Structures are given as structure tokens and as C-alpha cells.
Amino acid sequence: ALGRKNFIISNSNRDAVTWIDSWPNWPVACNGLNVFGPKSSGKSHLGAVWQSRSKAVQLNNPIVDIMKVPEILNNKKNVIIDGFDESWPGIPILHLYNLIKEREGFLIIISSKPLAQLEVLPADLSSRLSTLPVVEIKQPDDELIKQVMQKLFEDRLIADVEIFENPIKRTYTQDGKINFNGGD
């Protein structure tokens, strides 16, 4: 369930949710947004919320053929790119960006790092992307994890919420994964 009502808000994602909820009433010169954060932090879920509201085209894989850009966009004007990194060829994205701007549409780019920390080429694309506001979704905090676990239990009709009264300890593995252990 990737709808807005299923997206749980906490301090770790509140800024990003505020941006998405305020669309299309973004500042006048703002035609897009870069949402970044760690893996499994809710970026794609929040992107799906915006994609549904905006009727945007969603791209999860790099565009390699510049000639396909108009076909990909079809008659739409909003695009969400999920999983953007330095491996995406820049020329098709530059063409896509210009077409979105021409149609007065919006572009959301979801990435693990802020676009400014990526080596985006060509320079024209890097310059255009640098104008996008940037919002971070942080590592899920304890309150968010508690609410997500509670929702998962409720979805499975396990209604004994008393188990959430005990603190949950988190430890991080070297690869950034979270291990959960019961509290003391």
C-alpha cells in the first residue's frame, strides 16, 4: 500500500512530506525537487505518492536513447526519476529536463545522495539540476520504526500493541542494515 494515507510521518521524513504535500503550490521558479536519503528510508514510497497525484511518468532505469525521450514523456509533463545516480547518461536527461520545462511540468529526482554530490554530466545538465531544491529523508528514527511495525502488526490482525511499549534497540551492520533487538 503506497498511498499517502499509508505513509507514516516522523521527524526523519517530515520535510520531504511537506514538499510533496504542497505540490503543485511550490515556489514559482521551482519546477522540481531532489529527494535523497538512505536505502529503505521511504523515498520510493513518497515518490509513488507524488507520482499518483501528479500523473507523472516514472523512470526507474536510465534512458539510453535520446530519441526515445518524447515517446517516454508522451503527452505528460511530470516525471519522477527513482534511483538516479552517476550511471544515468546525461544527454537524455538534459533533453527530458528541457522538455518538462517547455511543458511547464515538474521533475522529481530520487537519489541516495544529493545531486550536488554526484558527478553529473554534461555541465549544462548539472547546472540545471543545481537549481532544484533538495530535501533529505533521514535514516528512520525510533518513532517511525515503532509506527511502521505497529501498522504491519495491525495489517496482519495482530492487535496486541503492548509489545510496542518496550523499547527496541537498533544496531547497524557495516553495510548499513539495521538489526533490531528487544529492549531491556
Where are these regions (language model features)?
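Dynamic helix-loop-helix/coil hinge segments at AAA+ ATPase domain boundaries and subdomain interfaces
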Residues: A1-D15
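Walker A/P-loop nucleotide-binding motif
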Residues: V28-L46
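Short regulatory helix/loop adjacent to the ATP-binding pocket of P-loop NTPases
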Residues: L115-S130
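Conserved AAA+ ATPase "SRH/arginine-finger" region at the nucleotide-binding site
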Residues: Q117, L132-L144
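Conserved AAA+ ATPase "sensor/coupling" helix adjacent to the nucleotide-binding pocket
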Residues: L132, Q147-I158
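The conserved phosphate-sensing helix
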Residues: F164-E165, T171-D184
